[in-house]
C-alpha cells in the first residue's frame, strides 16, 4: 500500500514538473523573441506618459485580468500578443509607428479600438463536452470597451481540462479552432 501511494505521489510530482518545465520553456522562448520588441513597447508607453504620444491604452496584458486557474492557458493562447499595444484609433497607432521609425526604436504591433472587431466562434454542443472550460474570451475579465479586441484575439480559442479532452474535441469538431489545455498544451486550428 505504501509503495502504491509513493508511486502515485511520484507520478503526480512528475506531471507537475513536466508542466512547469514546459511553461518555463515557453516563457523563455517568448522572452528571447521579445527582446527587441520589449524596448519599443517601453518606448511607446513612456512617450505616451510624457505627452509625446497620445491615445495609448496600454498592452493587451494591461486590459485583461485572468483567474489563477486559467493563467497558464491564457498566457499560452496569447503568446506575444500580450505585448501588443491597444490604441484609441488608427491615427494613434500610425503616430506611434512613425515615432518608433523616426527614432529607430524598433517595431510594435498595434490594435486600434476603432478597427479591431472580433467575433466569438460559436460551436453548437461544445459547451456540453466533458472537460470543456470555456472559450478563452469568456475566461478573462475586461472592460466592455475592449470587447472587439478580446474577442478578436481569444474568441476562437477553447480552453479545456487536459490533452485527452483537447484531442477528442479537436477531432470531433474537425480541427476548426485552437484548443489550449489548462497546463498550456496547444492543438492549433487545422491540426
PLM regions and their residue ranges:
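Residue-level encoding of the coiled-coil heptad register
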Residues: 1-7, 11, 18, 25
Amino acid at each position: 500500500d505504501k509503495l502504491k501511494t509513493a508511486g502515485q505521489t511520484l507520478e503526480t510530482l512528475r506531471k507537475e514538473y513536466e508542466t512547469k518545465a514546459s511553461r518555463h520553456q515557453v516563457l523563455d522562448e517568448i522572452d528571447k523573441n521579445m527582446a527587441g520588441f520589449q524596448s519599443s513597447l517601453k518606448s511607446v508607453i513612456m512617450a505616451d506618459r510624457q505627452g509625446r504620444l497620445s491615445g495609448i491604452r496600454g498592452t493587451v496584458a494591461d486590459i485583461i485580468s485572468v483567474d489563477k486557474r486559467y493563467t497558464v492557458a491564457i498566457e499560452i493562447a496569447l503568446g506575444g500578443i500580450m505585448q501588443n499595444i491597444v490604441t484609441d484609433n488608427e491615427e494613434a497607432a500610425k503616430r506611434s509607428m512613425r515615432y518608433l521609425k523616426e527614432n529607430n526604436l524598433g517595431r510594435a504591433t498595434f490594435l486600434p479600438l476603432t478597427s479591431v472587431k472580433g467575433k466569438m466562434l460559436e460551436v453548437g454542443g461544445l459547451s456540453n463536452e466533458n472537460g470543456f472550460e470555456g472559450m478563452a474570451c469568456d475566461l478573462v475579465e475586461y472592460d466592455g470597451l475592449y470587447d472587439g479586441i478580446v474577442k478578436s484575439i481569444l474568441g476562437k480559442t477553447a480552453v479545456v481540462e487536459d490533452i485527452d479532452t483537447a484531442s477528442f474535441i479537436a477531432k470531433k469538431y474537425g480541427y476548426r479552432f485552437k484548443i489550449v489545455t489548462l497546463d498550456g498544451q496547444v492543438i492549433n486550428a487545422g491540426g
